Amino acid sequence: MAAAAVGAGHGAGGPGAASSSGGAREGARVAALCLLWYALSAGGNVVNKVILSAFPFPVTVSLCHILALCAGLPPLLRAWRVPPAPPVSGPGPSPHPSSGPLLPPRFYPRYVLPLAFGKYFASVSAHVSIWKVPVSYAHTVKATMPIWVVLLSRIIMKEKQSTKVYLSLIPIISGVLLATVTELSFDMWGLVSALAATLCFSLQNIFSKKVLRDSRIHHLRLLNILGCHAVFFMIPTWVLVDLSAFLVSSDLTYVYQWPWTLLLLAVSGFCNFAQNVIAFSILNLVSPLSYSVANATKRIMVITVSLIMLRNPVTSTNVLGMMTAILGVFLYNKTKYDANQQARKHLLPVTTADLSSKERHRSPLEKPHNGLLFPQHGDYQYGRNNILTDHFQYSRQSYPNSYSLNRYDV
């Protein structure tokens, strides 16, 4: 009987214990990935600042990042068996029709090339800002991304926000203004470059949602496509700006530093590539709000590590402005999350009559093209749990929902 009792107790507690153990392992995995993400992000930014302080060629750093992305992603895509992008349909009927959906003929010039140009311009602007101003201040200015997204969504998508969302932007504005006024190493070109990079990231995030939703391309596959196309914008700029400046200056002091500089450029490119992959991995393990909190924490870590390692002079008021802006980003994400949860409750039908009513009042249907759905009249639809990040729009695949739902800026 005692043995039976023990056996029964083991049977009752076994699944719960296994579930608890699995949850602990999952939590440990997320924590380890977050710590690695923070270390790579902070280390990469410090390395970028060290490079640009001694080797003032920001386009070269951006080119190394793009090349690292193009070199590192294809093996990863093959290892993870990420499906290839759908083929582009021709102007007429294909003699060998594809078994899957096709992309429209103007997909690449209309969507991919503008996004690739945005990736190129945002990367160059971001490195110019790190070159001109401290890393801590550049990342504080990046905290203005929610402001840009709200403004651009209002202008482009005619999307209105709730009063709470607008109020949540006040700490971000106040923090950035306070950090700007008290920044001891302020540079106007650095501020303009950081704002331009943030604006470009915001536009990229908005329109990459449409591409991901309409094309059904995997986000890492799209990231690889954008990186390969961005090289064509980057190389001419590198030749005209960095290479020509180096050849004209004929400064041979760089020659003996080349091995060290090349090593730092390789480390910087690897850190940037690894950040993208780890950010994707974390996003697929946690909720959108948890990801936004992790990303805001990452920004705090980058600012803190850069202040400790680079020892740029700051005041207590300056630090207060930085932290206020970062906490404002978290408040914005929390407000958006609450608003989205409330909106989702209203979207769920309670009765059959509610369901029929929703069907009657549905917005214009998406227009099919070669098996894909492309929205009419700008009524864009996107997948759930879209997350705005510093470098690329990652999307957790799920059921379609409206554009205004589940968007978080970090």
UniProtKB/Swiss-Prot annotation:
<comment type="function">
    <text>Putative transporter.</text>
</comment>
<dbReference type="Pfam" id="PF03151">
    <property type="entry name" value="TPT"/>
</dbReference>
<dbReference type="GO" id="GO:0055085">
    <property type="term" value="P:transmembrane transport"/>
</dbReference>
<dbReference type="GO" id="GO:0016020">
    <property type="term" value="C:membrane"/>
</dbReference>
<feature type="transmembrane region" description="Helical">
    <location>
        <begin position="252"/>
        <end position="274"/>
    </location>
</feature>
<feature type="transmembrane region" description="Helical">
    <location>
        <begin position="165"/>
        <end position="184"/>
    </location>
</feature>
<protein>
    <recommendedName>
        <fullName>Solute carrier family 35 member E1</fullName>
    </recommendedName>
</protein>
<keyword id="KW-0597">Phosphoprotein</keyword>
<dbReference type="GO" id="GO:0005794">
    <property type="term" value="C:Golgi apparatus"/>
</dbReference>
<keyword id="KW-0813">Transport</keyword>
<feature type="transmembrane region" description="Helical">
    <location>
        <begin position="50"/>
        <end position="70"/>
    </location>
</feature>
<feature type="modified residue" description="Phosphoserine">
    <location>
        <position position="363"/>
    </location>
</feature>
<keyword id="KW-1133">Transmembrane helix</keyword>
<feature type="transmembrane region" description="Helical">
    <location>
        <begin position="312"/>
        <end position="332"/>
    </location>
</feature>
<dbReference type="InterPro" id="IPR004853">
    <property type="entry name" value="Sugar_P_trans_dom"/>
</dbReference>
<feature type="transmembrane region" description="Helical">
    <location>
        <begin position="282"/>
        <end position="303"/>
    </location>
</feature>
<dbReference type="GO" id="GO:0015297">
    <property type="term" value="F:antiporter activity"/>
</dbReference>
<feature type="transmembrane region" description="Helical">
    <location>
        <begin position="188"/>
        <end position="207"/>
    </location>
</feature>
<feature type="transmembrane region" description="Helical">
    <location>
        <begin position="133"/>
        <end position="153"/>
    </location>
</feature>
<feature type="transmembrane region" description="Helical">
    <location>
        <begin position="111"/>
        <end position="131"/>
    </location>
</feature>
<keyword id="KW-0472">Membrane</keyword>
<comment type="similarity">
    <text>Belongs to the TPT transporter family. SLC35E subfamily.</text>
</comment>
<feature type="transmembrane region" description="Helical">
    <location>
        <begin position="222"/>
        <end position="242"/>
    </location>
</feature>
<dbReference type="InterPro" id="IPR050186">
    <property type="entry name" value="TPT_transporter"/>
</dbReference>
<keyword id="KW-0812">Transmembrane</keyword>
